[in-house]
A protein has these predicted regions:
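Catalytic center-proximal scaffold of phosphoryl-transfer enzymes
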Residues: 1-194
Length: 194
């Protein structure tokens, strides 16, 4: 599963042998983006944060070209094209790490990136693993926004049922189906098989 750097996921990976945790490049990128905002505009383009963002952008650009490939072809291209970019990024950050110091947004960004290196490299080893979890986060965004509206759900069972319905709706969307029509189909067809 592709996740942010929340330690619980890494603990779960150690406990569950079949689980592989992959790091999310968007989360890593976000740390550098936030660090860049506190750097004066005049010197921003010469900063380590800016240069790291440009390197991450180059990785994403190359990854975008692989979208229509099979997972096997994507894996080959990861090794040939993208792995050297990722290697160069981590080498660059490690070489400049001491110049940053131990505090501030940029130091946090560098620490996060280096602590997550193992997980951020997972997508290079498997053509089916995406670089980030944006697709998943987009899918749950509506659920998170609607959280206030669902405060009226006052039982565990009600919450579980809401989650099931929401999951079915998101699955329909992910498969290019119209959720309303899909529910209509399910509610018509399921009783026929009971």
């Amino acid at each position: 599963c592709v996740t942010d750097g929340y330690q619980v996921y890494h603990t779960a990976e150690r406990v569950l042998e079949h689980l592989t945790v992959a790091g999310c490049w968007v989360h890593a990128r976000r740390y550098f983006d936030q660090a860049l905002k506190v750097i004066p505009k005049k010197i921003r383009s010469q900063s380590l944060g800016y240069l790291v963002l440009k390197q991450i952008q180059a990785i994403y650009r190359e990854e975008g070209k692989l979208r229509d490939l099979t997972s096997e072809e994507r894996l080959r291209q990861h090794q040939v094209v993208i792995k050297p970019l990722v290697d160069a990024l981590f080498l660059y950050v490690k070489q400049h790490q001491t110049a940053i110091g131990g505090q501030g947004k940029l130091a946090q960004a560098v620490t996060y990136l280096l602590n997550q290196e193992k997980y951020l490299r997972v997508f290079l080893e498997n053509g089916e693993v995406p670089m980030d979890n944006n697709t998943s986060e987009r899918a749950i965004r509506g659920f998170c926004i609607g959280r206030k509206n669902w405060q009226l759900i006052d039982t565990i069972r009600g919450a579980e049922n809401s989650a099931i319905i929401y999951s079915i709706a998101e699955t329909a969307k992910a498969n290019d189906l119209k959720p309303y029509e899909y529910f209509e189909y399910l509610l018509t067809e399921i009783p026929k098989h009971m």
